[in-house]
Design a protein with these regions (language model features):
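Inhibitory N-terminal propeptides of secreted protease zymogens
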Residues: 2-128
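Protease zymogen maturation seam
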Residues: 83-165, 178-179, 365-367, 420-422, ...
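Glycine-centered tight turns that cap/initiate beta-strands
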Residues: 115, 290, 313-316
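Active-site core segment of subtilase-fold serine proteases
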Residues: 137-227, 248-256, 260-262, 353-358, ...
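Extracellular S/T/G-rich loop segment that most often corresponds to the catalytic His/Ser-adjacent loop
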Residues: 170, 306-394
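Short helix-loop-beta-strand segments that form the rim/entrance of peptidase-like active sites
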Residues: 220-241, 245, 398-411
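Substrate-binding/access-modulating region of protease and related hydrolase catalytic domains
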Residues: 235-311, 324, 368-383, 419-420
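C-terminal subdomain of the subtilisin-like protease fold in secreted/lumenal serine endopeptidases
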Residues: 254, 258-265, 276-277, 394-432
């Protein structure tokens, strides 16, 4: 059973320790009031990461959970201490625990009396998981590419994606990226991906995860140059966000007629159970005919399910290696992964400045960037599939669900033994 411990670092790879410490410090140093972030571990190492002092509860069990925890009923709690109870989405509430009780203790007692899945931690979600913990963005830190480098895979020569709206939940769009890179022209920024002030000597630092959303949008646009893409900064705290906050934001987007929700998320959960707030959001999404959700499988190199990709209603994308014929060493895999697409050494738009590596074995290494980068991960195989779906929609008149099913059928028809269903950019020659 996973449990929180101050010794969670014991036996955990330095790579994973660096990633978690980065997130913990970022939450602690954020300007708004944020809960303390902790790691739970199991026999293999870190199991999941979550917010201490608050839990998510299914609404139909709320009064029973309050009774188990020795709390007053929902009405009294709302009347006396309303700040301790917040609606996340219909069917799920966020409960702030009494000061003396930990999340681990509270959930152990709730599960003992009501079983698993009634209440869960408020999990920390990050941009497309790695490191054996379902955390942190791509499979590698970004590598420099010259500014005049062309995208790889290349920009298709047609106008695919016209009339298709894609909501990209990521780290936002870098200021000026849509002007600096022709294939990003017209991409909308719901939120920007801000760079910090320059350091003395004119050095522009690039923080961890900055530029991730711009790179993903660039890959997507190479597949569907005419698609309407709205990039939002959902992961402003070191590439991470709490499940409760993210789902509240996503619920508001359901009213805007989005065709494809592209979520750059891959996270592990307590007992590998579904994220209950996301579960309710997906139910709401599927009430809208034709809309779909797509997410990366994550970069832990194992078959353990990551969320939200493991939900039946989500199209989940793994990564192919550089030969486009084998499974990338870092990609997650298994029956819950729907399709694989190229995800190693892609080249696309990025920030200009100095990036200092924060993950072993390159910790402290400074890398200079000029607006383009080479990057690997399921974060970047996923927008290839999203772009192919959008391009098919504009070509055939199908809605997103119909286009996705047709492409998944195509992927299954060309499945590679030992890998699985595969989709490749239709305009790009397979590497030798």
């Amino acid at each position: 059973m996973p449990e929180e411990t101050e010794n969670w670092r014991d036996g955990v790879s330095q790579h994973a320790v660096d990633e978690i410490d980065c997130i913990i410090k970022a939450f602690r140093g954020s300007s708004d009031r944020r809960p303390e972030i902790k790691a739970a571990r199991n026999q293999r190492g870190v199991d999941h990461v979550y917010a201490e002092g608050q839990i998510l509860v299914r609404a139909e069990y709320l009064d029973r959970v309050l009774e188990i925890l020795g709390e007053q009923g929902e009405r009294d709690l709302q009347a006396n201490t309303p700040e301790r109870l917040r609606r996340v989405i219909g069917g799920v509430a966020l409960l702030t625990l009494a000061d003396s009780r930990t999340v681990s203790d509270a959930l152990d007692e709730i599960e003992r009396q009501l079983g698993r899945g009634v209440a869960t931690p408020d999990h920390v979600l990050t941009v497309a998981g790695r490191g054996g913990i379902g955390l942190a963005c791509p499979a590698t830190e970004p590598q420099p590419a010259y500014f005049d480098a062309e995208p790889y895979p290349a920009v298709t020569g047609d106008h695919g994606g016209a009339g298709v709206m894609i909501y990209l939940a990521d780290t936002g769009l870098l200021d000026g990226a849509d002007e600096a890179h022709r294939w990003l022209a017209g991409v909308q920024a719901d939120d920007m991906d801000p760079l910090p002030p320059m350091l003395p000597g004119g050095v522009q630092p690039i923080p961890p995860y900055t530029g991730h959303g711009t790179f993903v949008a660039g890959v997507m646009r190479c597949m569907a140059p005419a698609a309407e893409i709205v990039v939002t900064n959902c992961f402003s705290v070191a590439g991470s966000q709490l499940e409760s906050d993210l789902v509240t934001k996503l619920e508001d987007e359901l009213k805007h007629g989005v065709d494809i929700f592209h979520l750059s998320i891959a996270a592990r959960s307590r007992h590998d159970l579904p994220l209950i707030a996301f579960e309710q959001w997906l139910k709401r999404l599927h009430q809208t005919k034709g809309s779909i959700c797509i997410a990366p499988a994550g970069n832990d190199g194992h078959r353990r399910p990551n969320w939200p990709g493991a939900f039946p209603g989500v199209i989940t994308v793994g990564a192919l290696g550089g030969d486009w014929h084998s499974r990338a060493s870092f990609t997650n895999f298994g029956g819950w992964v729907d399709v694989y697409a190229p995800g190693r050494d892609l080249i696309n738009a990025y920030a200009a400045g100095t990036y200092t590596c924060h993950v072993a074995p390159y910790t402290g290494q400074a890398r200079e960037f000029y607006g383009m980068a080479k990057w690997s991960g399921t974060s970047f195989s996923t927008p290839i599939v999203t772009g192919l779906i959008a391009a098919r929609m504009s070509r055939t008149g199908e809605n997103a669900a119909q286009a996705a099913e047709a492409l998944l059928a195509e992927a299954r028809s060309q499945a590679i033994p030992g890998v699985g269903p595969v989709l490749l950019p239709h305009h790009q020659v397979r590497p030798d």
